[in-house]
Every structure is written in C-alpha cells, then in structure tokens.
C-alpha cells in the first residue's frame, strides 16, 4: 500500500488557473465530456497523464463497441458527439464497420494513430483546453466539494482549480485521492484480468478467414498441450483498416494478488506489481505472436508489429454514486426515469482462468444508464464516468464498452455545464432540462 505525504502548510505550487470545469482523464469518456461541456459554453480543462488524448481507445484498443443493440436487426443507440468521432475517422479513410461474433453488435475498427488526432482536434475546436503529461497527486476537498488538484508535470508540481469536476480517470484516481467511497475490484467479486494487446503485419487475410473463432480456440488448446505458454485459450484477432495488419486481444494477467501479509492488492496498490504486469504482458504477447506464426493459417509470413502503449485494464475501482447499476438491471434491460445513455452489450467478464463469461441481453434491447450512477455519492460538485462509474462488478462488465463511455461523457459534460450556469448541484436540476439539452446534442435516450 502506498501512502501519500500531504504538502506542508504554506508551501505553494505554480497555479495553472481556474476553470468552470476540470475533467480528469482524456479517454473516451473524459474527452467527450470536455467537448460537450465546452460546446455548451463552459470554460473547460481536460487533463491526462498520457502524451495524447483517447486513453484506452488510443493506447490499447482499436475498436468501438456498444453503438448498436444486439441481434440481427440492430438499432443504433449511441449518437451525437460519438458520431463526430467516427466521422473524423472516416475522413481519414481510417475506419471500418466490423461484425462481432461475440454478441456485442457491430464494431467500429479504426487506426488509433488517426484517432489521437481526431480526439485532439474535436477537443480543440470545442474550445476546451487540454493538458497532457500531467499526473494527479493530490485533491483538496472541503465539505464534499472538490476545490483544487495538485498535478505532477515536467515543470514540477502545479495546482489547478475549478467549480466542478468530472472523474474520468478509469481508475477513479480523483475520487480515491478525494476520499470518496468506492468498491475495489476483487473485494466482493473476482476482479477482471489485464490484457496487453498487439498487432501483426504481413498477414494473409484471405487465408486467415478460412478458419472461424472456434477453430482458432482449438488451435490455441492444441498449442498449449504442445508446450506453448498460452494462459488464455479464447483470445481473438481481427482485421484492421491498415492493409495486411491484424490486431489481437489474447493475453491474460491477473489484476489482483495477495501480498506477503495475505492481503489482497491490485496493480494500483503496489507500483512494482503494475511494472511486473507490463513486462509480463509483453512477454506473453510475444509467445502468442509465435503461436500465430507457427500454427494459424495466414500468419505464416507475418511479424509482430507493436504492443499496446499500456497494458489494458478492465476494472480497478468503481465509485459509489447516488445509484449503482446492478446485474439484474442489465439482464432485464431496465429503463430509468433519469436515463442519459443506453447499453446493449453483453456482460463480458474476463475473470482469472482460461475462459470468459458471457451473459447476453435480449435481442434488440438495451439497459438505460441513469444519471444518478454518474453522480458521486459523497460529493456536491463531482461526477464520475467511464469504467469507474457506479455499478456492481457484473453490470460494469457490460456498460464499460467505449461507446457507452462516450455517451456517459456527453451526459456528464452537458449536466455539468447546466449545473455551472445555474449554480446548482446536478442532483438538484430538473431532469427534463438535462434530457432536453442531451437531445439537442444527438444523444439517444430510448431504444
């Protein structure tokens, strides 16, 4: 466990300014929140620890899932600013729609390098300001109100303040440092695993298409029995907009473990654990690449091209909101009076072991995502979006899809802008006002 020293009284840091809204995290959720709030007239700063915007969408993955309901007669359930993102990718000739064989609906596969530019362009054009290479160190809170952040930058420690905050860090870093309540992955239900993704080049796509996913999994099992170190035997690969290049989701590493005292710790508790996971993930990916070249049709002359910038993290902390979305909400495709987004993705639980648990929603249906699940229970001026929003383990395993993260971002950005303008808490605003504002952005609120 790491303990953070508070700065001494009287010690001052360089101040970077005061904003209406600070969004901590510029991933799919945070970037859309910043864009939505800035378009609504707020003075916005969005901050990220990486050197580019997009978070997992640009550092780890290359496909948006969640735009459609499940089934053959799919309905589009995410729109507005997320459509602007897809249009930006299409402008580069850098996206394809790809059917998904795992029940998550049609996916939008893209070139992550172009997506970085798209995200940053949309943020800039919205009027929001972006700060990269900035790591959150400390949060100042008084009576449930976040006041100021301390950031570690290449220029040293700096402070920045705002009237309203959105935690879009993925790991709930803002809420954690603020002392707000959350459930840590693994405390109640088994935590989802980590994945280092990788790409292969010089792939013969026509040959690769001759075997389906079931045969690929059989080949993985056969290779494991022959001595290949493949801990996950249900991994996947797919074509990309880049010719003769495939992307993979194959590796698997545990995100929690017991320390020397027998206490459960995650990759957020021990920096050496996260470091070891990054190193092990790349080593594991290299073994999967060897398997592909040796055993899978179409890969005979291919080469490993690149690893994800970061190891992919599915679940760490889930903040307690005014409402927690639960498993039964998802499976019943429950609708809420205050829903601000929709999700039709299955519960996709990448637990420890060699398999993945899938539980599907009824065809053509979607669960509503209530505004209350985005309002931090312990704060009067903070919302939480993305994969650290308020949900149980199972519900989170469905709603963490990137299209839903974008939809949550729009909802939080619009709600925050109204709260700032009206000088009210989000929970005090008439929902009809938020719903009307969301509809104007093109957001889809009903199936």
What residue ranges belong to the model's regions?
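Conserved N-terminal/central alpha/beta ligand/cofactor-binding core
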Residues: 2-7, 36, 42-43, 48-138, ...
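A short, basic/flexible loop-to-alpha-helix module at the beginning of a structural domain
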Residues: 4-18
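Beta1/beta-strand and adjacent pyrophosphate-binding region of the FAD-binding site
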Residues: 15-27
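N-terminal Rossmann-fold NAD(P) dinucleotide-binding loop
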Residues: 30
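Flavin (FAD/FMN)-binding glycine-rich loop and adjacent Rossmann-like elements that form
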Residues: 56-57, 116, 152-153, 157-164, ...
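Short, hydrophobic/aromatic-rich segments at coil-to-beta transitions
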Residues: 143-149
